[in-house]
């Protein structure tokens, strides 16, 4: 029991636990009693939902363009490259990392036991995340149409930290990084059928989310793909007939499918918890915004999960 409590006290689990709890409390205030503390909704929302909040000069001063989302993915790709290179190098040179660096990495996650992630699984997971992050970077640059909406520095910082922590958490729990083994190897035979199924599901969810991103962008584009306006509109067709935010739903599915690939990863469980709560509250806040903004918004639509939530 004490060992388990110590694991939570490690840097990454503790950060994710505190962040998730703070996010949940802030979003509850925003949804249930936004007028109790006007600063909380201003810090919790961004984009179109933030435009609905009363002006807050402090938050406005520390806000950045929403189109800076691309920084999340650019920094995430760089971190992924470093992590992939590190894991690959350790396979052929166990002494690739300096002992001081290994000690620092060990403090980020559980250090009392041998990390359960094999190099084969680690490389597969990091490659899958690279696919996801590269796709999101492409969409933010070439697909999405951003208005003049902004997000505060709190969202910006949390987003950047998230895409740095995601690959690092997997690397830290890989054999050879936080533990020394006499011999490491990579083999396709190390990947189970369940892990391959998770990889396929991960790809399908990414493809579906990409289609949804294009569908959202098309509400602001004309027949020839030229931007015709920056106003917010209502999407119809497919998943949008069931929920207001299917792209958030598939974001959750992407992270859950990756869990099939790395089921023994410890810190990743905290990441899933953070993503699920973040996307759920974001969907509820967005869903509420649609109903307040468009009087004829379809009442049969749910926020995130068809027929349920």
UniProtKB/Swiss-Prot annotation:
Its main location: endoplasmic reticulum. The keyword Transmembrane helix applies. GO terms for molecular function: polyprenal reductase activity; polyprenol reductase activity. One of its GO terms (biological process) is dolichol metabolic process. PROSITE patterns: S5A_REDUCTASE. The chain crosses the membrane at residues 12-32, 72-92, 114-134, 151-171, 184-204, 242-262, 270-290. Its EC number is 1.3.1.94. Pathway: Protein modification; protein glycosylation. One of its GO terms (cellular component) is endoplasmic reticulum. It holds the Pfam family Steroid_dh. It is found in: Endoplasmic reticulum membrane. Keywords: Endoplasmic reticulum, Membrane, NADP, Oxidoreductase, Transmembrane, Transmembrane helix. It is a multi-pass membrane protein. InterPro entries: 3-oxo-5_a-steroid_4-DH_C, Dfg10/SRD5A3. It catalyses: a di-trans,poly-cis-dolichal + NADP(+) = a di-trans,poly-cis-polyprenal + NADPH + H(+). Plays a key role in early steps of protein N-linked glycosylation by being involved in the conversion of polyprenol into dolichol. Acts as a polyprenal reductase that mediates the reduction of polyprenal into dolichal in a NADP-dependent mechanism. Dolichols are required for the synthesis of dolichol-linked monosaccharides and the oligosaccharide precursor used for N-glycosylation. Belongs to the steroid 5-alpha reductase family. Polyprenal reductase subfamily. This is Polyprenal reductase. It comes from Caenorhabditis elegans. The lineage of its organism: Eukaryota, Metazoa, Ecdysozoa, Nematoda, Chromadorea.
């Amino acid at each position: 029991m004490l060992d388990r409590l110590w694991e939570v006290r490690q840097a990454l689990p503790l950060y994710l636990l505190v962040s998730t709890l703070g996010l949940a409390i802030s979003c509850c205030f925003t949804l249930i009693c936004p007028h109790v503390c006007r600063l909380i909704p201003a810090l919790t929302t961004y984009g179109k939902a933030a435009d609905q909040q009363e002006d807050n000069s402090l938050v406005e001063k520390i806000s950045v363009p929403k189109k800076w989302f691309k920084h999340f993915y650019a920094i995430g790709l760089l971190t992924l490259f470093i992590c992939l290179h590190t894991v690959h190098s350790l396979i052929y040179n166990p002494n690739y990392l300096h002992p001081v660096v290994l000690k620092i990495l060990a403090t980020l996650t559980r250090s009392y036991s041998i990390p359960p992630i094999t190099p084969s699984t680690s490389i597969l997971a990091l490659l899958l995340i690279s696919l996801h992050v590269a796709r999101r970077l492409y969409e933010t640059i070439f697909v999405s149409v951003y208005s003049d909406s902004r997000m505060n520095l709190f969202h910006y910082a949390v987003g950047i930290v998230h895409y740095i922590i995601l690959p690092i958490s997997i690397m830290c729990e890989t054999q050879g990084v936080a533990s020394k083994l006499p011999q490491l190897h990579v083999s396709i035979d190390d990947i189970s059928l369940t892990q391959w199924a998770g990889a396929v599901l991960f790809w399908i969810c990414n493809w579906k989310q990409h289609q949804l991103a294009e569908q959202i962008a098309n509400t602001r584009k004309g027949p020839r793909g030229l931007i015709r306006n920056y106003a917010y509109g209502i999407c119809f067709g497919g998943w949008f007939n069931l929920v207001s935010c299917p792209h958030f739903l598939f974001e959750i599915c992407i992270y859950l499918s990756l869990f099939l690939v790395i089921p023994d990863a410890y810190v990743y469980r905290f990441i899933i918890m953070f993503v699920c709560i973040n996307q759920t509250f974001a969907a509820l806040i967005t869903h509420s915004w649609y109903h307040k903004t468009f009087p004829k918004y379809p009442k049969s639509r749910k926020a995130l999960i068809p027929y349920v939530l």
